[in-house]
């Protein structure tokens, strides 16, 4: 079992989640494929970097992310920064021969994502984009049922991701509301998770027809005191423009003939982290709700007439990733476990000299879908989704 030294760039919300995963992964999956060593963490502010190192268990801290790239003892570069920094860091890490895990979205645009993909595709390195919700055991179980043909040929997919943290017009103008940093709003921030799951479960998108809406066109300028999402109340004072979407709705045509839709917003009062999908096929249906993430609802046409309807499967040791989680079904998993599973699969690929999905290729394809959604909304028409070449 080898030790792999990790350099984490970004000490915020996602830095916390990734650090937890590195510490806990060997406790859940033992023997671990490799042992993540929390070597150094980078934050632009030296004091914040030092504090993050103490809090998240890193041996060292730095205010210069380039020192992580230049360090020959670092094996893994973890990018947990705002979106505008992803491409520069990832390309530098690839040129240095580091394995890379990058938070989603891969980048702000398809063009940036292509540059990242081009930087890694011919290198002998493992690269991953952190669409962690597909690591939820119930989602992986849905994939298993689909691959086994349990619901027949897929006809339709309906996915949503609804949050409410930006519904307050007085929440400040954090970077997530600025196109120059984020690239997009709800589209890149949360819809990408559902788009990734749609590709994972159903297949490639061939065309989209979308609407993008910005409900709150300006917000108070941020003056400190906000949390990782920028949510504080009482925004008196000057305001700045919001130039990203608050809500996205898109219809989908899949390459295999199925149809679908994705809706995402961060302005839905009462919806904290509401991720759902329904998949209907010729022989059955699958329903998932992340707020009940230990459960998968299934219905099969083959059931006798007096037993037809949805049944609930509680995930546990008999299901995907069950060997590393909890010994009794429905004991409950959280967001952290999806990150732990993600870390396990990433380090397993490194240890075995393999690859892992979702890779930068997947992140690039999602970015092309996002670009097509933006184009469709501007044109108010269907737009074909380009496919990356292998």
Curated annotation (Swiss-Prot):
Gene3D superfamilies: Dihydrodipicolinate Reductase, domain 2, NAD(P)-binding Rossmann-like Domain
EC number(s) from the headed UniProt entry: 1.1.1.425
Binding site for levoglucosan: 104, 133, 163, 176, 189, 193
Activity sensitivity to pH: Stable in a pH range between 5.0 and 8.5 at 40 degrees Celsius for 30 min.
Alphabetical UniProt keywords: Carbohydrate metabolism, NAD, Nucleotide-binding, Oxidoreductase
GO terms, molecular function: nucleotide binding; oxidoreductase activity
Catalytic function, reaction form: levoglucosan + NAD(+) = 3-dehydrolevoglucosan + NADH + H(+)
InterPro entries xrefs: Gfo/Idh/MocA-like_OxRdtase_N, Gfo/Idh/MocA_oxidrdct_glycsds, GFO_IDH_MocA-like_dom, NAD(P)-bd_dom_sf
UniProt enzyme class: oxidoreductase
Binding site for NADH: 13-14, 43, 81, 83, 86, 103-104, 130, 132, 175-176, 335
Temperature dependence: Optimum temperature is 60 degrees Celsius.
Pfam family, one: GFO_IDH_MocA_C3
Tree of life domain: Bacteria
Quaternary structure annotation from Swiss-Prot or TrEMBL: Homotetramer.
PANTHER family to which the protein is assigned, alphabetical: BCDNA.GH03377 (PTHR43818:SF11)
Protein task: Catalyzes the oxidation of levoglucosan (1,6-anhydro-beta-D-glucose, LG) to 3-dehydrolevoglucosan (3-keto-LG). Exhibits high substrate specificity toward levoglucosan and NAD(+) for the oxidative reaction. Exhibits weak activities (about 4% compared with that of LG) toward L-sorbose and 1,5-anhydro-D-glucitol, and activity toward D-xylose is also detectable (1.7%). Can also efficiently catalyzes the NADH-dependent reduction (reverse reaction) of 3-keto-LG.
Recorded domain comment: Contains an N-terminal nucleotide-binding domain and a C-terminal substrate-binding alpha/beta domain.
Membership in a protein family: Belongs to the Gfo/Idh/MocA family.
Designated name of the protein: Levoglucosan dehydrogenase
Originating gene: lgdh
């Amino acid at each position: 079992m080898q030790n792999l030294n990790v350099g984490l760039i970004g000490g915020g919300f996602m830095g916390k989640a990734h650090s937890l995963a590195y510490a806990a992964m060997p406790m859940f999956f033992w023997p671990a494929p490799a042992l993540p060593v929390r070597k150094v963490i980078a934050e632009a502010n030296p004091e914040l970097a030092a504090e993050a190192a103490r809090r998240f268990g890193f041996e060292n801290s730095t205010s210069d992310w380039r020192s992580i790239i230049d360090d020959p003892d670092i094996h893994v570069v973890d990018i947990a920064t705002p979106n505008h920094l992803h491409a520069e860091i990832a390309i530098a890490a690839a040129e240095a021969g580091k394995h890379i895990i990058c938070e989603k979205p891969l980048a702000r645009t398809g063009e940036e994502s292509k540059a990242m993909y081009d930087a890694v595709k011919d290198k002998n390195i493992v690269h991953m984009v952190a669409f962690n919700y597909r690591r939820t055991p119930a989602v992986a179980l849905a994939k298993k049922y689909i691959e086994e043909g349990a619901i027949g040929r897929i006809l339709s997919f309906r996915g949503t991701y609804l949050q409410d943290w930006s519904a307050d017009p007085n929440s400040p103008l954090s970077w997530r509301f600025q196109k120059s940093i984020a690239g997009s709003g709800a589209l890149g921030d949360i819809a990408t998770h559902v788009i990734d799951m749609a590709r994972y479960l159903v297949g490639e998108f061939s065309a989209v027809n979308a609407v993008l809406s910005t409900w709150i066109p300006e917000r108070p300028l941020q003056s400190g005191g906000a949390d990782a999402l920028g949510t504080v109340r009482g925004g008196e004072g000057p305001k700045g423009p919001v130039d990203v979407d608050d809500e996205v709705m898109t219809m989908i045509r899949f390459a295999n003939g199925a149809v679908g839709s994705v809706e995402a917003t961060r302005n839905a009062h009462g919806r904290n982290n509401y991720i759902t999908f329904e998949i209907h096929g010729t022989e059955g249906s699958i329903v998932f709700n992340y707020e009940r993430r230990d459960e998968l609802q299934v219905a099969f046409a083959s059931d006798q007439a007096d037993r037809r309807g949805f049944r609930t499967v509680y995930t546990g040791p008999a299901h995907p990733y069950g060997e590393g989680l909890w010994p009794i079904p429905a004991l409950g998993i959280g967001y952290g476990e999806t990150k732990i599973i993600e870390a396990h699969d990433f380090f397993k690929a490194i240890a075995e000299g393999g690859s892992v999905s979702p890779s930068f290729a997947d992140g690039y394809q999602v970015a092309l879908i996002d670009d097509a959604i933006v184009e469709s909304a501007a044109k108010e028409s269907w737009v074909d989704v380009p496919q990356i070449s292998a």
